[in-house]
Amino acid sequence: MRSPHSLLLALAPGLLAAAPPSPDVRLRAIVAPVSAAHLRGDVAALVGFGTRHTLSSQSDPRRGIGAALNWGEGEFRRYSAACGGCLVTARPSTMVQGERVPGPTRLTDVIAIQRGTERPNDVVIITGHIDSRVSDAMNATADAPGANDDGSGSAAVLEAARVLSKHKFPGTIIYALLSGEEQGLYGGKLLADYAKAQGWNVIANLNNDIIGNSCGSDGVCDSTHVRVFSEGPRWQGREALAAAQRSQGGENDSPSRNLSRFLDSLADRLHIGLDVRQIWRNDRFGRGGDHTEFLNAGYPAVRLSVAVENYNQQHQDVRIEKGVVYGDNIKVMDFPYLAKIVKLNTAALAAMASSPPPPAPRVEGAVSPDTRVQWSRVPGARNYVVRYRRTDSPQWQVTKRVEDSCAQGRPACPQLVVLPHIRVDDWVFGVSSISADGFESPVASAVPGGAFKPYAPPPPK
């Protein structure tokens, strides 16, 4: 006869096998196939089109922006064929003209849509711009390899599609190759407008622009950090929000700032040898990127970029001058470093497509020793986490897990948490949603403009 102890040992493997792996374990498994060699191949293919300038040929089958876009769409279609048609491609386009586009020009983005199985209207978007340039922003004929700027971001988009299309997610993932960035962020605006026209609930845009070199023009190297740029006070709706933010706070709690915190926390848990360096400004000093157009439309967005830039390789004619090599050449890229950044992107997309959207919390507590945090029920959420931190703290300090208090069939059911002896004056509060299988959304702060949806002023009383 078996002893109870031996019976317990016999049962233990089965019990352990029945327990589902944690979200972090699942995310590590999902991103494991990200390949530095595959990324190198994609960047090499993009460089092979000679130039990808927005004003270059759209009809030449081997050279120019048109050939590059066609190739990118072909890669999306190839990945879709491997997953039974799980990706649907589209080519949003518009006519543009401006300071760096002297005549009316057709501008096209290429996107692949991986529709969610439960919440197809909840969307996360990864972007990289496929266009390139040399020293003269108007030179559309010279070779402009654009290996790092932004072949690296475009390769990240394609690799994310290759890896994630092998899985299914409750929410939708959009993979987007954008045009016209170097001429005026046209591709970002085109896709943000397209998202609005489709009625998508955009949870996040992860814009990847210059993510493939680990050594700067001054010789400083850093392959263990990625910079994440995020706006502070929310830009969209800023006039209407200004007075409320002055009274209630929100300078450091835009949805994009919380998206940056989300990426920072995720990188720490992935254990891939990469740490997020949060940069608390919208973009590099005096410069811009396509994520800005998503922010202008009211969608949460951040820019990911290398820890140290090499200015000799950006926006430069390909040449050697006084022994210095100029030009955006594939030889200066660090593909193992690029692969780590792509793993972070891929994990973030998978996590946000698996979690419910963030709530839209509100806080009350003026002239009271207690604080009340309220929000409406989020479809798909099993639990919530209330977080708070001192007003001068950069990261959330206190967490309180809360079960959904509503009966099934009451989608508008309010949630309420009372925090006794926590004075609202001294803290910033936020709430995240958790799915039934444990995936947690980014935190939305209970401040004016903290909700992840585009800001809409309240109706007049």
What are the roles of these predicted feature ranges?
Residues 417-441:
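Beta-strand-rich modules
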Residues 178-289, 297, 301:
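Metal-dependent peptidase/peptidase-like ectodomains
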Residues 112, 126-127, 131-132, 136-185, ...:
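Alpha-helical metal-binding/catalytic segments enriched in His/Glu/Asp
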